[in-house]
Amino acid sequence: MGSSQKWVIGLLLFSSIFFELTAITLADDKLEESRWGNDNGCGFGRRGCGGGRFGGRGPSFGRGRGAGGGFGGGAGGGAGGGLGGGGGLGGGGGAGGGGGLGGGGGAGGGFGGGAGGGAGGGLGGGGGLGGGGGGGAGGGGGVGGGAGSGGGFGAGGGVGGGAGAGGGVGGGGGFGGGGGGGVGGGSGHGGGFGAGGGVGGGAGGGLGGGVGGGGGGGSGGGGGIGGGSGHGGGFGAGGGVGGGVGGGAAGGGGGGGGGGGGGGGGLGGGSGHGGGFGAGGGVGGGAAGGVGGGGGFGGGGGGGVGGGSGHGGGFGAGGGVGGGAGGGLGGGGGAGGGGGIGGGHGGGFGVGVGIGIGVGVGAGAGHGVGVGSGSGSGGGGNGR
């Protein structure tokens, strides 16, 4: 055999071996790809693979578990894993889920949002120091906490009134603004139910009289703006049921008498100008009179601006049953004796006569009775 034939046979043998090995290698690659469905040679969850159908471990920045894997694979892989913690945009975490850039609760919504809110409460808006819960401008507390200026149920009067945390000293209920008292405390101008008068009048009168500003109640009640009683109008303003108690303590020392402007007391002294039913008179008259200047039973409203009887109009104004008693300690003599400065001027039944008149036309029981009854610098039985 020649040398040329040997070369041909050797070349054919080498070529067959080379092509056989090449075919085997290429076939293996194709088979592997068709079996695992992956260009990277990854199997089920094999390490180093990025986002198979069942969530392998991420190959990119964060490797970490589930970086875009799971059902959100594909786009979630790579960078989403490392930074996102819980996964990529499509995974459990990411910007939208529990993890994301913020981790933990994170900025993400969904379930992560809820948990984040709770923890964020505390010092924040959820309550505590921040307001929200206990406080709030409209709540029981207020911006500053405690009771505060907050409105709503219990602000001032109402249920909060009784206890009077805001009362007495402050303004709240009970003794405060909304309750028996007024703006300044004990009595005063306070509005609302029992503001001065009404139910609050009774008790308010006794204690709040003499010393305090408002007497029995507030502007509408037994007490008034100035002294023991005051100007308070309305039913029971000074007089009425509240008069009795209010008169006693408030009468003696204080300015006002049994009631307010419409009641036993007046602007200045024991009784006053008050007209209307029971103005100075009534049950409250007795206590309000005596020392304070008003007559025994309130002589025509307890008296006028100055003394015992006075200008009081309406039933029993000036004279009447209170005429005689109007003398008493404060009547009879002096400018205000028996009547007020305008004593006897009052019209109606039982009109007082003259200045300081002790005796009046149509005088009731005790007419002309008292220390100065029947005397005084004024004389005559003539009224103007």
Swiss-Prot record:
GO cellular component terms, A-Z: extracellular region
Record's signal peptide: 1-27
Q: Where in the cell is it found?
A: Secreted, Cell wall
Give the superkingdom in one word.
Answer: Eukaryota
Q: What's a GO biological-process term for it?
A: cell wall organization
Print the keywords alphabetically: Cell wall, Cell wall biogenesis/degradation, Repeat, Secreted, Signal
Q: Does the keyword Signal apply?
A: yes
Question: Function of this protein?
Answer: Responsible for plasticity of the cell wall.
Additional remarks: This protein contains 67% glycine residues. 90% of the mature protein residues are capable of forming a beta-pleated sheet composed of 8 anti-parallel strands.
What is the protein's given name?
Glycine-rich cell wall structural protein 1
